[in-house]
Regions:
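Metallo-beta-lactamase
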Residues: 90-145, 152
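Metal-dependent catalytic neighborhoods of phosphoester/phosphodiester hydrolases
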Residues: 73-81, 106, 225-233
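Conserved beta-strand hairpin/beta-sheet module of binuclear metal-dependent hydrolase folds
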Residues: 1-56, 145-162, 179
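Short, solvent-exposed loop/turn segments at secondary-structure boundaries
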Residues: 20-21, 115, 191-196
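Short helix-capping segments at alpha-helix termini
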Residues: 83-87, 110-114, 235-240
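Active-site neighborhood of phospho(di)ester-bond hydrolases with catalytic His/Asp-centered motifs
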Residues: 38-42, 59-69, 96, 158-162, ...
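Active-site metal-binding motif and surrounding structural segment of the metallo-beta-lactamase
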Residues: 44-92, 178
Length: 252
């Protein structure tokens, strides 16, 4: 790995519910040099995290929004750091306002998260995390949802949509050549009114218009044809398009 390169390992790529065996909630491990940033940690994804790396070596976890399929496995991460090490080890977590109190409420225990997670809110503009930069901007989904860009130096980065109901919200983050990891919840189907999600056509269009260098589709609902979703996005953009699964690895 060169100083300006990134690696992406998919630990989870599922939506809130699915019948696909082995599917887990959103979790994407981005590494550059000695820095490891985890984007989201949804239901069931901690197992894949722990099978792949020592979780306590994470430089940071960045959470896109406060829906359980994107953050709930912070609970097993907290437990692991608390009970497998004496004294407990700590990991930085960046997320929407209220994340720590949401975790505390799950256990009806004030200070539950703070035992081993250093939780802070997303801030405007790029921030430096180890050797990487991270920038989060608000997108339409919940009242406090974020898309996130991770980059190493001036090279192409990774833009993660989180859950997003308006593809144009991603434009400020995407630089020419970036990899766009974007939800295509509805596959090729029309997006249900008020759902605040995207389909493959939305993703392909914004990727083409912003000069993305690669498209990775994720978060596709059960019953939607994933192959057709890839074809629909690929028809709109002249770059590689794939749909991701746990265990997939990409050199960006």
């Amino acid at each position: 790995m060169t100083p300006s390169s990134l690696e992406l390992t998919v630990l989870g790529a599922g939506p809130a519910y699915t019948n696909r065996l082995g599917s887990t909630g959103a979790a994407y491990l981005v590494r550059g040099g000695q820095t490891a940033i985890l984007l989201d940690l949804g239901q069931g994804a901690f197992t894949n995290l722990a099978a792949g790396i020592e979780p306590s070596t994470l430089t940071a976890v960045a959470i896109s929004h406060l829906h359980p399929d994107h953050f709930v496995d912070l609970v097993p991460l907290r437990h692991y750091l608390r009970y497998e090490f004496q004294p407990p080890r700590r990991v930085a977590v960046i997320g929407p306002a209220g994340l720590a109190s949401r975790l505390d409420a799950l256990h009806d225990q004030p200070g539950f998260a703070a035992v081993s997670l250093d939780v802070t809110d997303h801030q405007p503009g790029p921030v430096t995390i180890g050797s990487l930069s991270l920038e989060a901007i608000r997108v339409q989904h919940t009242t406090d949802s974020y898309a996130i860009r991770v980059a190493a130096g001036q090279g192409p980065g990774l833009v993660y949509s989180g859950d997003c109901g308006r593809a144009d919200d991603l434009r400020p983050l995407i630089r020419p050549g970036d990899t766009l990891l974007a939800e295509a919840t509805y596959g090729t189907d029309p997006v249900a009114p008020g759902s605040n999600h995207l389909n493959a056509h939305d993703v392909g269009r914004v990727a083409a218009e912003t000069g993305a260098g690669r498209v990775l589709l994720t978060h596709v609902l059960m019953g939607r044809d994933r192959g057709k979703a890839v074809s629909a996005a690929a028809a709109l953009v002249r770059v590689p398009v794939d749909v991701v699964d746990p265990g997939d690895h990409f050199d960006l």
